[in-house]
Amino acid sequence: MVEYKDSLAFIFWRNPEQKGSVLKSIGLLDKIRGLSKKDFFLYLMIISIFLPFYLFLGLFALYLIGLLVTGEMKGIIKGLAKHPVLLFFIAYSSIISIVAKNWLGLVASLLMFLFLIFFSFYQKRLTHAFFRLILQTILFGSVLSAAFATLEHFQIVKKFNYAFLSPNMQVWHQNRAEVTFFNPNYYGIICCFCIMIAFYLFTTTKLRWLKVFCVLAGFVNLFGLNFTQNRTAFPAIIAGAIIYLFTTIKNWKAFWLSIGVFAIGLSFLFSSDLGVRMGTLDSSMEERISIWDAGMALFKQNPFWGEGPLTYMHSYPRINAPYHEHAHSLYIDTILSYGIVGTILLALSSVAPVRLMMDMSQESGKRPIIGLYLSFLTVVAVHGIFDLALFWIQSGFIFLLVMCSIPLERRTLVSDMTD
């Protein structure tokens, strides 16, 4: 056990009976106290994802500076050579952003590089027990977020106002919950991820308290998702849940459970809050199609190379298109921003993790973790038809927390994958 009296961590450890009683009641406190000093500060960095993005980015920068000061950064940078295609893609993204004078795209490319550094270190420190602790904590944090979403929905608390960062950052979506995630659609996809995590933890634990908590957290996140009024998220969560069930169970139970998930999803989709927005679906689709047409028009101007991340926001005045941050489609925005060349590089960087997943699929005991990965990808694929919610600091971070565990879970014995 590491001695923490000379660190800030001692504040957390010194009186577990008085602090963290809720965490203790759901079995997290003992696991947190068992972390090494390095893992504890990594854990704190990870859970700060539930703070507003500007606070998270500040802590993220401090954490990377800490890695530099402690000498960890040198080893991490050397290890990046294991990801040549990804490095080349980030360099490519930076260069085309500079050529196009797309400075926001350059900032986004730099953030990609910093994420690569962080998640390389994350993979180095990750164990299966630590990964499960992270998932359980994210699920716990999502329950608190849903509680805040409820307060937002009933206007008991005011929404976060980002105008102090820029006059353009007004309070949008007055009647839709977004919690600390800047936009209801970003919070919506995070709810989807958390529901998938609840499915995974429920099917891989023998602990009764954790099963009960997963069921509770799943429904709480459904209500949080409802408060976002995110129409795209419900087809995504239905598809993700069905993929998870069929990957994991593979019998008639999966079919009937899928019918149940579909029914619950539809009931929420046409509930009072979302039903109001469903009534404006025709006009919203017309707006989406106009954005997609503008995105494709911009793509045709530079089909091979692209102009870097957030190309739509950078280039929309050229064709007198309406202002939007992106092309409201994962698929259109990707080819628009990175061109054919960059999209091919992205696809090539995905080959290694796909191969690892295919290897894992040969072991029947690893169906649940494969189901988690596939359900995440399904949520992104379906949600991405109408939006680009993954390309945000917090939603992208949570996605990578899960997907970057693929090399670890490939090595983990099936007997060690439950608790």
Model-derived features: where do they sit?
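A juxtamembrane structural motif centered on a specific transmembrane helix
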Residues: 1-37, 209, 366, 401-419
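Loop-to-helix entry and N-terminal half of a specific, functionally important transmembrane alpha helix
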Residues: 37-45, 85, 358-387
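Transmembrane alpha-helices of multi-pass inner-membrane enzymes
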Residues: 62-68, 372-419
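Transmembrane alpha-helical segments and their membrane-water interfaces
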Residues: 67-74, 96-150, 356, 382
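Alpha-helical transmembrane segments of multi-pass inner-membrane proteins
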Residues: 132-162, 179-248, 352-357, 377-381
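A membrane-periplasm/extracellular boundary helix in multi-pass inner-membrane enzymes
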Residues: 147, 153-156, 245-285, 293-301
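A conserved mid-to-late transmembrane alpha helix and its immediate loop/hinge
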Residues: 179, 222, 296, 323-357, ...
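Long extracytoplasmic/lumenal interhelical loops at the membrane interface
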Residues: 274, 281-293, 297-301, 305-338
